[in-house]
């Protein structure tokens, strides 16, 4: 499910994310594309948004995570990360916070795809239980 903008002349968030991936044109774009694919596999009904002047955000009954791109890192920030189990210890940033946790991916890093999809599914379940 893709969320589209109702404003005339604005591109859908999904198209903006596509353009960002293409614009990056390097390992960051490849990483963001791979992460996006994994998120969609884990949560097929995910909604994509484009926030804060260029940050992809994935929603399902609330925010799941962002996909921020910087010069040397792709940062995946989970809004309720502190409440998620992370048995494979994917979270490696923002560990001191009360709510958020992040996964920083640098060039050449390997992401445990199975563990990542489990985190996405758990975040979706947590959002669903909070929405009731």
Model-derived features: positions:
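Charge-dense, helix-prone N-terminal extensions
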Residues: 1-132
């Amino acid at each position: 499910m893709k969320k589209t903008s109702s404003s005339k002349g604005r591109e859908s968030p999904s198209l903006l994310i596509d353009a960002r991936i293409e614009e990056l044109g390097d390992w960051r774009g490849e990483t963001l594309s791979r992460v996006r694919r994994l998120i969609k596999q884990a949560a097929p009904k995910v909604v994509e948004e484009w926030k804060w002047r260029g940050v992809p955000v994935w929603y399902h009954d609330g925010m799941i995570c962002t996909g921020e791109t910087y010069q040397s890192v792709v940062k995946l920030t989970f809004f309720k990360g502190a409440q998620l189990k992370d048995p494979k210890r994917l979270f490696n940033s923002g560990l001191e916070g009360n709510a958020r946790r992040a996964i920083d991916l640098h060039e050449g890093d390997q992401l445990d795809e199975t563990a990542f999809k489990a985190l996405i599914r758990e975040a979706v379940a947590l959002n669903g239980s909070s929405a009731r």
